[in-house]
């Protein structure tokens, strides 16, 4: 898959793989509510990044901005999962650090798209 040569796509793809493996550590009562929402958002973010990577310069910006909003919402949901103790603080720190890195990459992509 050539698209994984794009660093932000690879980082998000790898995060999903890690996130998927954490599923069984989440209490069952949260697994089918908030966790499922987070997992869906992560897939939507991955889809948005892939879609944006294949668009012309003029069509990228709105897609990237929508993806950024989804990323911010995902961060909020992950924080909520930590606060309700659906995930451990250690898991939260790991996931949040990766999300921050993806956010910086996405912000840079948005900025470079606006400058063109």
Regions found by a protein language model. Name each.
Residues 1-116:
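Amphipathic alpha-helical assembly/interaction segments
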């Amino acid at each position: 898959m050539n698209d994984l040569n794009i660093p932000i796509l690879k980082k998000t793809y790898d995060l999903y793989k890690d996130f998927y493996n954490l599923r069984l550590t989440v209490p069952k009562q949260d697994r089918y509510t908030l966790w499922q929402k987070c997992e869906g958002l992560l897939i939507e973010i991955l889809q948005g990044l892939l879609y944006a990577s294949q668009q012309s310069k003029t069509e990228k910006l709105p897609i990237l901005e929508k993806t950024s909003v989804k990323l911010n919402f995902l961060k909020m949901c992950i924080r909520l999962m930590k606060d309700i103790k659906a995930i451990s603080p250690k898991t939260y720190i790991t996931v949040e650090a990766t999300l921050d890195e993806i956010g910086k990459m996405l912000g840079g992509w948005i900025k470079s798209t606006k400058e063109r």
